[in-house]
From Swiss-Prot:
One annotated GO molecular function: rRNA binding
GO biological process: regulation of translation; translation
GO CC field: large ribosomal subunit
NCBIfam families tied to this protein: rplA_bact
Subunit structure of this chain's protein: Part of the 50S ribosomal subunit.
Protein family membership: Belongs to the universal ribosomal protein uL1 family.
Pfam families linked: Ribosomal_L1
Stored InterPro entries: Ribosom_uL1_bac-type, Ribosomal_uL1, Ribosomal_uL1-like, Ribosomal_uL1/biogenesis, Ribosomal_uL1_3-a/b-sand, Ribosomal_uL1_CS
Protein name (Swiss-Prot/TrEMBL): Large ribosomal subunit protein uL1
Gene: rplA
UniProt keyword list: Repressor, Ribonucleoprotein, Ribosomal protein, RNA-binding, rRNA-binding, Translation regulation, tRNA-binding
SUPFAM superfamilies: Ribosomal protein L1
Record function comment: Binds directly to 23S rRNA. The L1 stalk is quite mobile in the ribosome, and is involved in E site tRNA release.
């Protein structure tokens, strides 16, 4: 493994690796130890006590963070007829039908989120092998396959984030930027944590929030004390 740089080591030395901090302390410390020379993202990782091999323990969804993520999302909408106008008026960056299928097949990816009306999924389905691995395939569970394209686009633009438990049961998500106030980051964190608590599968046994950490882009991780987390 490559040796971390001096700046990283100095930042990491400020974090007690044996300690689990309160949410407020952890977020403040993560911001303090950010070493990026840009407005870094603040990321969280929840390791959940679930078995993702079981169909009833898959966790996937989306949540609108009260203070957004600080990142502007470029939205592509696949729609027909009056839904095209609806999407455009809601602020979608790109709206169309099969012409965007062809563009994507040719290697175009100037977008961050894809929304589709159900009647367009036959066309969008052709892109499964391309969009799937990038996590861009529209999905009803995340509200990106819907006839209410206005709501979908507005929520994404307002700071909606998708979450999904990986094989090891870990959910990664961005909760904002280092430039955010501690209060706004804590509020975003608690909103996401509350959603994950409500998503706990009834068949999941043992400790649900196994470990949680917060970090910034390129910065050291800070462990969070989960003992006060409510389920």
């Amino acid at each position: 493994m490559a040796k971390k740089g001096k700046k990283y080591q100095e930042a990491a030395n400020k974090v007690d690796r044996t300690k689990h901090y309160s949410v407020e302390e952890a977020i403040s410390l993560a911001k303090e130890t950010s070493i990026a020379n840009f407005d870094a993202s603040v990321e969280v990782a929840f390791r959940l006590g679930i078995d993702t091999r079981k169909n009833d323990q898959q966790i996937r969804g989306a949540v609108v963070l009260p203070n957004g993520t600080g990142k502007s999302q470029r939205v592509l909408v696949f729609a027909k007829g009056d839904k095209i106008t609806e999407a455009e008026e809601a602020g979608a960056d790109y709206v169309g039908e099969s012409e965007y299928v062809q563009k994507i097949q040719q290697g175009w990816f100037d977008f961050d989120v894809v929304v589709a009306t159900p009647d367009m999924m036959g066309e969008v389905g052709k892109l499964g092998r391309v969009l799937g691995p990038k996590g861009l395939m529209p999905n009803p569970k995340t509200g990106t396959v819907t006839m209410d394209v206005k709501k979908a686009v507005e929520e994404i633009k307002a700071g909606k984030v998708e979450y999904r438990a990986e094989k090891a049961g870990i959910v990664h998500a961005s909760i904002g930027k280092v430039s955010f106030s501690d209060e706004k980051l804590v509020e975003n964190f608690k909103t996401l944590q509350d959603v994950l608590a409500k998503a706990k599968p009834s068949s999941a046994k043992g400790t649900y929030f196994k470990s949680v950490a917060v970090t910034t882009t390129m910065g050291p991780g800070v462990k969070i004390d989960t003992s006060s987390f409510k389920l």
